[in-house]
């Protein structure tokens, strides 16, 4: 399902005080700064095998929300995994964790927001949970809801 990005500030003005807006000050790393789409979730801690598997599937314009428990000890996404997501049609990644290969990520046509960078690789044991609600930044990210992201922040709208 393709969702057209909209300015998050406009969405906040339309929705009002009950808006689901992420409080975390995530930084832009991808080459696409405005992105939107249905949410798929992964919860993992310093291990990126599951999220790599998810990004290997057709994204259909979706947004993968990755809850890495706020760890910046290892990077969950680098250039290879980001390119995998881009080539499979994912609109963007929202990462409560770190990325690496930041200079290359900026050249890829995929949205990527994360807490920061660390060149250290994560483990690849496959531990983690997929397609369950995750919460960070004061927002519950529920699979199927719609995420909108731009330079101002992230807003989540209930599906339907």
From Swiss-Prot:
Binding site for substrate: 78-81, 100
Catalytic activity: 4-hydroxy-4-methyl-2-oxoglutarate = 2 pyruvate; oxaloacetate + H(+) = pyruvate + CO2
Key words, A-Z: Lyase, Metal-binding
InterPro entries: RraA, RraA/RraA-like, RraA/RraA-like_sf
GO annotation terms (biological process): regulation of RNA metabolic process
Cofactor remark from the record: Divalent metal cation.
EC assignment: 4.1.3.17, 4.1.1.112
Residues holding a divalent metal cation: 101
Signal peptide: none
Cofactor(s) named in the record: a divalent metal cation
Name of one Pfam family that matches: RraA-like
S-S bridge residues: none
UniProt family annotation: Belongs to the class II aldolase/RraA-like family.
Protein name: Putative 4-hydroxy-4-methyl-2-oxoglutarate aldolase
């Amino acid at each position: 399902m393709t969702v057209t990005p909209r300015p998050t500030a406009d969405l906040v003005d339309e929705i009002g005080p009950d808006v689901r807006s992420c409080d975390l000050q995530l930084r832009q790393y991808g080459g696409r700064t405005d992105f939107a789409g249905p949410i798929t979730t992964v919860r993992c801690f310093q291990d990126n095998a599951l999220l790599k598997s998810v990004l290997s599937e057709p994204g259909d314009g979706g947004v993968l929300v990755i809850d890495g428990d706020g760890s910046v000890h290892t990077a969950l996404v680098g250039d290879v995994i980001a390119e995998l997501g881009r080539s499979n049609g994912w609109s963007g990644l929202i990462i409560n964790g770190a990325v690496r290969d930041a200079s290359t990520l900026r050249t890829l046509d995929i949205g990527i927001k994360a807490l920061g960078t660390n060149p250290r690789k994560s483990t690849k044991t496959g531990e983690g949970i997929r397609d369950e609600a995750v919460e960070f930044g004061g927002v519950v990210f529920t699979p199927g809801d719609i995420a909108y992201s731009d330079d101002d922040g992230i807003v989540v709208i209930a599906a339907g």
